[in-house]
Amino acid sequence: MDWKLEGSAQKTESRVLQEHEITLDDPGEDGVSESFQLLQIDVGCEHWEQETLPTGSAAWCSKNVQRKQRHWEKIVAAKKSKRKQEKERRKANRVENSGIYPQHSKRFLRSLIKERLLEAKHSGPRLCIDLSMTNHMSKKELSRLAGQIRRLYGSNKKADRPFWIYLTGFTTDSPLYEECLRMNDGFSSYLLDRTEEDCFSLFPLETLVYLTPDSDHALENVDLNKVYILGGLVDESIQKKVTFQKAQEHSVKTARLPIQEYMVKCQNGKNYHSEILTINQVFDILSTYFETQNWPEALKKGVSSRKGYVLRNSVE
């Protein structure tokens, strides 16, 4: 009897323990299940929020986000506008470079340019770039001068009546020559004369006219019997009268562009007025005058308002 009661008690205890274990296990499984349900609810909510978020609505965007969006749209619009302007500029350049022969090939145009330049060598006006003053120029100044030579040559190729160009005092072992090769594609094939001689020994002195802003004499016209000299000098320290003094040392005539005769000073924020121009700007003026025989038109092309000068008739 006692054994039966003891066995029954053991069975009852075992059943209770099993039920207790099951009870302990069930909440764990329910807890995990509940956690999965919560995660599913969160994901569902996030998915619902994404689906129901009204795109572009100010109600769902902060002012900062809207401001950044407007800023980005402005940048994109500006880039599109810039690309369009660049495309139009290239198109205009192609038309300009082709001159009155837009229907002809590039090969024909190159042949035409070559023919004009070689004709200028025999019967056109002559321009000499005096490069004998580059020994003390910095690399930055040499780079700027090389760029000016490139632009000058480019303008001369486009001209209907080009000049024949001489680069004097120019040696192939000079830093300037290396800079010209580095910066200017096809420089070694430029149709112009390069020589180590200086301009004063290359031409008769009576045929030379040194163009310098320090001269007292204004240039009246472009004479085919003269050789016009431009000082190949880029000097950030702005030493005054360097080219004028060099011309005087060799007893060569000087002249300045007639800026004072056809232009007047204008007011600007910096109260800045200067007649000092780059060699390519001076050349643009000479070339335009030679084609048009009109100083106001020529000066307008080469002297920008940033120099502090405007044409007289524009203020009268």
From Swiss-Prot:
One of the Pfam families matching this protein, by short name: tRNA_m1G_MT
Q: Which superkingdom, per the lineage?
A: Eukaryota
UniProt domain SAM-dependent MTase TRM10-type: residue ranges: 113-310
Q: Which reaction does it catalyse?
A: guanosine(9) in tRNA + S-adenosyl-L-methionine = N(1)-methylguanosine(9) in tRNA + S-adenosyl-L-homocysteine + H(+)
Q: Which EC numbers characterise this protein's activity in its record?
A: 2.1.1.221
Where is region (Disordered) located? 77-96
Keywords assigned by UniProt, alphabetized: Coiled coil, Methyltransferase, S-adenosyl-L-methionine, Transferase
- MF (Gene Ontology): tRNA (guanosine(9)-N1)-methyltransferase activity; tRNA binding
Output the Gene Ontology cellular-component terms.
nucleoplasm; nucleus
* PANTHER family to which the protein is assigned, alphabetical: TRNA (GUANINE-9-) METHYLTRANSFERASE, TRNA METHYLTRANSFERASE 10 HOMOLOG B
The similarity comment for this entry is:
Belongs to the class IV-like SAM-binding methyltransferase superfamily. TRM10 family.
What is known about what this protein does? S-adenosyl-L-methionine-dependent guanine N(1)-methyltransferase that catalyzes the formation of N(1)-methylguanine at position 9 (m1G9) in tRNAs. Probably not able to catalyze formation of N(1)-methyladenine at position 9 (m1A9) in tRNAs.
Protein name as annotated: tRNA methyltransferase 10 homolog B
